[in-house]
Amino acid sequence: AFYNKFYAPNNAVLVLSGDIDVKTAKLLAEKYYGKLKRRETPERLEMPKLEESQRSRIEMSRPQIKGVRVSRNFAAPSYNMAPEYIYALSVLSAYMGEGETSKLYKKLVLEDRKALTVGTAYDPAARSYGTFTISAIPQEGVSPEELLEAVDAAWAEALVQLDNAELEKVKQKM
């Protein structure tokens, strides 16, 4: 049902890589896909605009998983929504939480010993909203709530103390 509903040449993207020129690519695409007829496909649904105050909390557990991970996920601009923010958010993610020299890792893992690990990730590859995620695993004896409070405090502190020289180092690595 899904295939017949959505799979149509007018709703597809053809990706080619390797040692091929444009002329040959067009000939091969026409040979293999040219006979396929255009079909009507359902109109894409647009994501509703998010209210800034929308919040939710989800807790999940599985008997086979003993550890705890806490995450904060934020709606963030995607390539399709606002490409002008992509580089800045990528730099922010690297600066704040990618690797052992990041601000959150230094503060929460090395200094305060609240987390075993902490990291950030920015994913702009979505049709509508992308995501910016901060996740951490608490040290033994640290509750998820305590760790989330520490994450929030470390984030706020790092933003206040933005270091231009360190930001430049992050940019050079990208």
Question: Which ranges hold each PLM region?
Answer:
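Solvent-exposed, non-transmembrane alpha-helical starts
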Residues: 27, 81-85, 143-147
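Bilobed periplasmic-binding protein/Venus flytrap-like ligand-binding cleft at the lobe interface
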Residues: 89-99, 150-157
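M16 family metallopeptidases and their MPP-like homologs
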Residues: 1, 11-17, 68-78, 106-174
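Short, surface-exposed beta-strand/loop micro-motifs that present aromatic residues
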Residues: 1-5, 54-62, 136
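Active/ligand-binding-proximal structured segments within catalytic/core domains
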Residues: 72, 82-96, 103-106
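An aromatic/glycine/proline-enriched structural segment found at the starts
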Residues: 13-79, 172
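A generic secondary-structure signal for well-formed alpha-helical elements
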Residues: 6, 10, 20, 24, ...
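Short, surface-exposed connector motifs at secondary-structure boundaries
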Residues: 8-13, 88
